[in-house]
Amino acid sequence: MSYKVNSSYPDSIPPTEQPYMASQYKQDLQSNIAMATNSEQQRQQQQQQQQQQQQWINQPTAENSDLKEKMNCKNTLNEYIFDFLTKSSLKNTAAAFAQDAHLDRDKGQNPVDGPKSKENNGNQNTFSKVVDTPQGFLYEWWQIFWDIFNTSSSRGGSEFAQQYYQLVLQEQRQEQIYRSLAVHAARLQHDAERRGEYSNEDIDPMHLAAMMLGNPMAPAVQMRNVNMNPIPIPMVGNPIVNNFSIPPYNNANPTTGTTAVAPTAPPSGDFTNVGPTQNRSQNVTGWPVYNYPMQPTTENPVGNPCNNNTTNNTTNNKSPVNQPKSLKTMHSTDKPNNVPTSKSTRSRSATSKAKGKVKAGLVAKRRRKNNTATVSAGSTNAGSPNITTPGSTTSEPAMVGSRVNKTPRSDIATNFRNQAIIFGEEDIYSNSKSSPSLDGASPSALASKQPTKVRKNTKKASTSAFPVESTNKLGGNSVVTGKKRSPPNTRVSRRKSTPSVILNADATKDENNMLRTFSNTIAPNIHSAPPTKTANSLPFPGINLGSFNKPAVSSPLSSVTESCFDPESGKIAGKNGPKRAVNSKVSASSPLSIATPRSGDAQKQRSSKVPGNVVIKPPHGFSTTNLNITLKNSKIITSQNNTVSQELPNGGNILEAQVGNDSRSSKGNRNTLSTPEEKKPSSNNQGYDFDALKNSSSLLFPNQAYASNNRTPNENSNVADETSASTNSGDNDNTLIQPSSNVGTTLGPQQTSTNENQNVHSQNLKFGNIGMVEDQGPDYDLNLLDTNENDFNFINWEG
């Protein structure tokens, strides 16, 4: 009998094709167990993390009972604010504040001492302790805080607050000193332990300080090892130890067995007779580590401590060890005995300052007082000279070459000539050229760069580049001639503006009292006596610049060239070298460059050289420029160029510019200049207005001096009383009537001079709407022959 296997029954034997079923069940069971264990482990880890977080949160609360109060500091502040509002009789404000701040406190109830808690909407708030004061603790606290804050910040404060603050400072200083002594004692103990010499000694810092001071007091502890080598311990790096020697640990007598501390030399400090039981409220000054009061004075054998705050005149007391140099004080009345001082100090000119380096050494500098030289009108003190602007009543402070404009400068003529040397590109009397680095530099900027050199001997030769003729205080005349040296190649500082100086031949006859200046050939001596009038033997004296009634353009000139007229050949001889551009980074002080004698004998140059011309160039970048020039009795002869005829403003004849051969020479050269036929104006008040000079040519004027209506850009007409000065009929074509020395100002609009001694008035020439030439810079030549040094009153560029 056989049985068939039915696969439908689950408990039947599985076929041979499925042998893996049992093993699969086992794997599934194991995986389920593993997942269960992993989930349990993750749950345990999460629980542990949560417990750690709770412990970290709850641990500070358990350890610090005041942490909750600190965390609720805002609630504490709100309580004090509520208390202040309540005691200030601000009931409504207190109620509104309590409602907004969620304060569970009765509106009319005063705070009491102690915590108080109430329930509100299920929330329990623990209030901090509120101090009960009559006007509110917040108000009283604020009063005390503000008073002490003002005292500590040196803003005042009450007397009690100042006393309290001083007591606090004194306690802090004493604590600082004690801490420094404790650090020193600990260092000594550490060094002794390192050497094996420490035997459990306890060193009191105050006893150690007393031993350092040499006070006869018992040591802090019984010293052991009496046979110890008493050698001081050098400690490098400790400022306290470096300032005084350390006494031995035990200086005992082996025969007697007793310990006796040998007193050391008392240092200089504020701990005189300080013991452990004495009052330590001595006069301490703070900073005990670096300004330690116990510094030795081993040279004082007496044994008395020297206090730094007292005056000790004994010769044995010397300064402490390692005294810094910065602590040495010197009063203003203390003067060194061995330092030579000069009796008079004079600021040098721009050329003499560049002679060489100043010798090293301490030299007392004193300011020389100038009581006689008068620079500006109505001024009797030359300590701060002023330059009066023509046409105005205001005066400007003159920077006349002093270092910081503090030293009186009366040699204005020397300054002016130095200014001409610095601003001039070449010399019209010599072939030497100035330094390229000094082109466009002002003398005041150069003076500020070079230090003032003390004049040791006032009787020595002057370092000025020009002859000095002056009068001393006793009335004697002395002429001192010095040799000029060209300034070195030195970088100078930039200066925005430099006031110009108006120079007249005689400064004593200026009745208008507006311009007080000096001649080019006159320079006061070191005693600053009033200048004396001398005849100018130069055939072509230096052109004088005046102050501008409007600020000068700060841009530099493009270039400047000079030439000389040769009377033998009748030619204008140009100087060596091409035109040299002025440094564009240095602002020019005036739009006119002047060439003056630079080297050689001045007298020989006066007799051998003849006048030349000056090329005026407008500032760079100006397409339309108005050149406003005021001349005084001068003859203007230009080079041979194209001319432009202009109309007279009063409808007169046309003034024609003429070019011809020079009658003084038979050579037909194109550079030869000749004086044309004289054209006299129809009246003394005839004026000429030049309005459109369109090219780089110049006008050849007759050998006369004319005056024109000077129309400024503000359309102001400066009409002067013009006169004509014809030349002499002799062979000298360069002779002109010299103007009076009192010509120093430009007459205002519709105003004539009332000075009877004024022979020649200001000659006004206006060049308007000067055009630029394509591919060229503007080049306007004004050949000034036989001009007086007072010819130019002012020059104003406007664009």
From Swiss-Prot:
The record's section on InterPro entries has: LisH (IPR006594)
Residue span(s) of domain LisH: 73-105
Please indicate which superkingdom the organism of origin belongs to: Eukaryota
Q: Which residues cross the membrane?
A: none
Q: Which UniProt keywords apply?
A: Activator, Nucleus, Transcription, Transcription regulation
Q: Where is the composition biased (Polar residues)?
A: 1-10, 270-285, 318-340, 371-396, 460-480, 584-593, 660-675
Record-level GO cellular component terms: nucleus
- The residue ranges flagged as biased composition, category Basic residues, are 354-370, 482-497
Q: Which GO terms describe its biological process?
A: regulation of biosynthetic process
Which SMART domains does the annotation name? LisH (SM00667)
Which residues fall in a compositionally biased region of kind Low complexity? Answer: 41-55, 307-317, 341-353
Query: Where are the residues of the annotated region Disordered?
Result: 1-22, 37-68, 101-127, 255-406, 431-501, 568-621, 644-691, 705-758
Give the subcellular location. Answer: Nucleus
Q: Transferase as a keyword?
A: no
Q: What does this protein do?
A: Required for diploid filamentous growth, haploid invasive growth and flocculation. Putative transcriptional activator of FLO1.
Q: What family does the Swiss-Prot or TrEMBL record give for this protein?
A: Belongs to the FLO8 family.
| UniProt protein name | Transcriptional activator FLO8
Q: Tell me which species this is from.
A: Saccharomyces cerevisiae (strain YJM789) (Baker's yeast)
Name of encoding gene: FLO8
